[in-house]
Amino acid sequence: MLEVAIDADGEWDSSRSWDGLVRRAAEAAIAESAFPQLATSGRAVEISVLLTGDAEVRDLNAEYRGKHQPTNVLSFPMAGPEDLRETNIAAPELLLGDIILARGVCEAEARDKDVSLEDHAAHLVVHGTLHLLGYDHHSEEDAADMEVREVRALQRLGIANPYEEAA
């Protein structure tokens, strides 16, 4: 059973409920991963998502990555591969980790890509969730695998391929 804990601060439009979008994006990413059972096994699985401003993300990016500027999404995995494979529903709750999105960066990127903030935020949650599941883009092969999984997850959400050039 997947639990997605969402905290959206004042930087994010409070008139929009981000809960459903974030949850669906995380579920889609898990479904397209090597660990789809995490969303359906009955085992308690949790992801925390913080929707915040650029300043907080800049500070976290500086502290944890040594980069003194905001980025669109940060992911902090907490589970190892052996934890992800565990299917016993009696196993302790699995904390996959934290995903943090920066409002200003997300908004600027969405505008540049000519997509809605909601679609871009969903893409970043998918991307962040895949990082929590051990995927990365350090090599071309890994990046290609991650991109395919992102595109398939976004298709589940009815969101166009963000890597495809507009005609």
For every predicted segment, state its role.
Residues 1-121, 132-167:
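An acidic/histidine-cluster motif and surrounding catalytic segment
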Residues 126, 130-131:
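Short active-site segment of divalent metal-dependent hydrolases/proteases
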